[in-house]
């Protein structure tokens, strides 16, 4: 029976154990009867509860029952005393009925108790309150009977409720903890898990129960000695009443079981944590080796262009993003495993290290595959980027070669050739870079089979290899075609350079010939002072003509070369319509002027030779000297020469040009006239010698 069940009855204080003891150390049970009618049933329940509190040892020392009848009637007292034989155990040794101050019929009362003495089994005495000290020490009596023992029924009841609650909770908790702890000690792991799972959490908090027990024990220990004036006053919460040793025993048992329970919880928590780690590890491993690896298996291509490679990179970044979430779980698990390893539980070290190694191997392998794939796609993107740049360079070079250029001069041709060479060199550099990128990509692809998870990647690799080699071969062919076209264009440009050079040199030949003509007309005007000088002038003139002839022939050859080059270049020669007529015109003018110069020099030679013969004194040939015809011939040649000096050179186009200036012609004519005068004088001397002598 628990106090909480009959709490309303206990609050009525129909009976109580004050904690006092008789001289035999037996407990004192007090029944305070009141004026109101006492319910025997409630009193019986109260007595049953109170008598269940003391230990068997206490009960063996017997009870002294004080029935306080001072405020009650005799019939009630009698009924209570008679009821004690059914409620109070046989160890009751004495019942003290405290009589009121009013007179009871002694004979009746004595007769009644004496009559029932044998049947009651205990002694019943009537005593006044002030006479109780004959049987019980004052310190063991409450203040109601003139004693010094302090008793607070409600305080006792509250403490009793606490005690019973603690006892009930601690007993139940001990059973639960024992079940849990015993279940955890079983050898069969399945039974252990089943028992722990079913009863792992106690119905009450062990910490709370322990705290309640300690507070209760502290209260019991403090209330044991609460007397005044240095005297000892026995508390109603004495250990014999509320079983202080029982509280201590319960606390000891609770501490022991709770310590075991905490260890079980720790082991359970560790096992749970280990199982959770193992489960998470397997989740990471299964995903990485399952869906994660499948994602990588499905991504083998490298794309056939920059856009395709970028699309594959974007897809790979999505795959990496999914992997990053699992790698984050890996980092967290690795930290948890490291913490457990540092805890130093030997029994779990092997399993933890195995899990850690398995997790690390899978994660590092998957991370390596992701990095390899990323590097492969980056290499493919760079390869396609170089290929695209090279293709654009080849397109630009091809476009430049396909346009038929018509440069204005050799300088522009040289500039065009330089630009072609630079573009071709840039193409060479780009092709070399493409080969390097392609070879690096091929090397990476060749290593792809090392992490193929058993998948045959021959087909995928062959497609990638064929694509890379195809791109490089295509670029090589395009570059070779451009080189061939550059060679053709270079030859054409060089021919055009030769054409421009020939045209330029031909124009220069015309200029030179014009300068020779100008020099002939302006400076080649002297006819010599005598035959010898004139012959020298004639010889120089012939050499001068040879120079002019060479210049003309050189110009003709250049113009013929331009015709051949134009035919080769399939273009119209600009020299044939301009330079060649100019060359021919100047040459004809030079020829006419040269012939005129030759005629004049030859006439001058004839004039000077004949004149010199006549003027020289040659007695051996008097007949010759006297030939009249010679004088006439000399005179005729002289006149013809003078006349010729006044006649301009008439070119084929009808234009006229004089040799030298009028003053130059006058000087030459004057010299001829002087010579003619000498010849005439000589003629006269030969005709009339006497005139010469007379004059002398």
From Swiss-Prot:
Keyword Repeat on entry: yes
Biological process, per Gene Ontology: negative regulation of calcium ion transmembrane transport via high voltage-gated calcium channel
UniProt keyword annotations, A-Z: Repeat
GO molecular function: phosphatidic acid binding; phosphatidylinositol-3,4-bisphosphate binding; phosphatidylinositol-3,5-bisphosphate binding; phosphatidylinositol-3-phosphate binding; phosphatidylinositol-4,5-bisphosphate binding; phosphatidylinositol-4-phosphate binding; phosphatidylinositol-5-phosphate binding
Gene3D superfamilies on file: 1.20.58.60
Protein name in UniProt: SEC14 domain and spectrin repeat-containing protein 1
Pfam families: CRAL_TRIO_2, Spectrin_SESTD1
Matches recorded under SUPFAM superfamilies: Spectrin repeat (SSF46966)
GO CC annotation: calcium channel complex; intermediate filament cytoskeleton
Record family assignment: Belongs to the SOLO family.
Residue ranges occupied by any CRAL-TRIO domain in the UniProt entry: 1-153
Subunit relationships: Interacts (via the spectrin 1 repeat) with TRPC4 and TRPC5 (via CIRB domain). Interacts with CTNNB1.
UniProt keyword annotation of Hydrolase present: no
Per-repeat ranges for Spectrin: 275-378, 381-494, 500-602
Highest taxon of source: Eukaryota
Gene: Sestd1
Biological role: May act as the primary docking protein directing membrane turnover and assembly of the transient receptor potential channels TRPC4 and TRPC5. Binds phospholipids such as phosphatidylinositol monophosphates, phosphatidylinositol diphosphates (PIP2s) and phosphatidic acid, but not less polar lipids including phosphatidylcholine, phosphatidylserine, and phosphatidylinositol. The binding to PIP2s is calcium dependent. Might be involved in the plasma membrane localization of CTNNB1.
């Amino acid at each position: 029976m628990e106090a909480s069940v009959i709490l309303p009855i206990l609050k009525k204080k129909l009976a109580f154990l004050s904690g006092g003891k008789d001289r035999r150390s037996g407990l004192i049970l007090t029944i305070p009867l009141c004026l109101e009618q006492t319910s025997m049933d409630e009193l019986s329940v109260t007595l049953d509860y109170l008598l269940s509190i003391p230990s068997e040892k206490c009960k063996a020392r017997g009870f002294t029952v004080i029935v306080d009848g001072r405020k009650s009637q005799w019939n009630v007292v009698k009924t209570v005393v008679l009821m004690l034989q059914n409620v109070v155990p046989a160890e009751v040794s004495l019942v003290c009925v405290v009589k009121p101050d009013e007179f009871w019929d002694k004979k009746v009362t004595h007769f009644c108790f004496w009559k029932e003495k044998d049947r009651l089994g205990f002694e019943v005495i009537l005593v006044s309150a002030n006479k109780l000290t004959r049987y019980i020490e004052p310190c063991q009596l409450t203040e109601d009977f003139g004693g010094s023992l302090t008793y607070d029924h409600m305080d006792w009841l509250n403490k009793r409720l606490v005690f019973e609650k603690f006892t009930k909770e601690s007993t139940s908790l001990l059973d639960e903890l024992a079940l849990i702890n015993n279940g955890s000690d079983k050898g069969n792991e399945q039974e252990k898990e089943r028992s722990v799972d079913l009863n792992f959490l106690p119905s009450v908090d062990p910490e709370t129960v322990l705290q309640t027990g300690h507070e209760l024990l502290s209260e019991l220990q403090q209330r044991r000695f609460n007397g005044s004036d240095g005297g000892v006053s026995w508390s109603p919460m004495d250990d014999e009443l509320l079983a202080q040793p029982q509280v201590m025993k319960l606390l000891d048992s609770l501490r022991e079981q709770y310590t075991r329970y905490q260890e079980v919880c720790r082991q359970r928590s560790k096992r749970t944590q280990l199982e959770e780690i193992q489960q998470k590890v397997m989740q990471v491993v299964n995903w990485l080796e399952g869906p994660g690896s499948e994602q990588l298996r499905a991504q083998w291509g490298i794309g056939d262009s920059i856009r395709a490679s970028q699309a594959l990179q974007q897809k790979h970044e999505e795959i990496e993003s999914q992997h990053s979430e699992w790698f984050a779980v890996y980092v967290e698990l690795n930290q948890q495993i490291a913490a457990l390893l540092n805890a130093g539980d030997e029994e779990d070290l092997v399993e933890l290290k195995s899990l850690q190694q398995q997790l690390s191997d899978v994660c590092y392998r998957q991370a390596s595959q992701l990095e390899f794939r990323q590097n492969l796609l980056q290499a493919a993107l760079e390869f396609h980027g170089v290929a695209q740049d090279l293709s654009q360079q080849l397109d630009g070079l091809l476009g430049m070669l396909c346009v038929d250029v018509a440069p204005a001069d050799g300088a522009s041709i040289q500039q065009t050739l330089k630009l072609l060479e630079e573009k071709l060199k840039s193409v060479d550099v780009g092709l070399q870079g493409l080969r390097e990128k392609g070879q690096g990509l091929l090397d990476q692809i060749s290593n792809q089979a090392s992490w193929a998870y058993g998948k045959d990647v021959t087909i995928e690799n062959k497609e990638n290899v064929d694509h890379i080699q195809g791109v490089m071969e295509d670029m090589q062919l395009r570059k070779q075609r451009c080189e061939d076209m550059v060679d053709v264009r270079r030859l054409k440009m060089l021919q055009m350079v030769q054409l421009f050079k020939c045209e330029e040199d031909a124009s220069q030949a015309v200029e030179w010939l014009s300068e020779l003509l100008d020099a002939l007309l302006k400076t080649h005007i002297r006819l010599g002072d005598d035959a010898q000088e004139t012959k020298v002038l004639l010889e120089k003139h012939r050499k001068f003509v040879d120079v002019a002839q060479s210049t003309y022939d050189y110009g003709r050859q250049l113009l013929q070369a331009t015709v051949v080059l134009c035919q080769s270049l399939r273009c119209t020669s600009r020299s044939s319509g301009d330079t060649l007529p100019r060359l021919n015109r100047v040459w004809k003018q030079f020829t006419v002027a040269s012939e005129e110069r030759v005629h004049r020099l030859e006439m001058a030679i004839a004039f000077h030779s004949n004149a010199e013969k006549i003027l020289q004194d040659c007695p051996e040939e008097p007949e010759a000297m006297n030939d009249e015809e010679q004088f006439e011939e000399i005179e005729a040649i002289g006149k013809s020469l003078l006349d010729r000096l006044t006649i301009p050179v008439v070119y084929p186009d009808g234009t006229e040009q004089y040799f030298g200036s009028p003053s130059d012609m006058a000087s030459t004519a004057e010299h001829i006239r002087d010579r003619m005068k000498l010849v005439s004088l000589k003629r006269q001397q030969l005709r009339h010698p006497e005139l010469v002598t007379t004059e002398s």
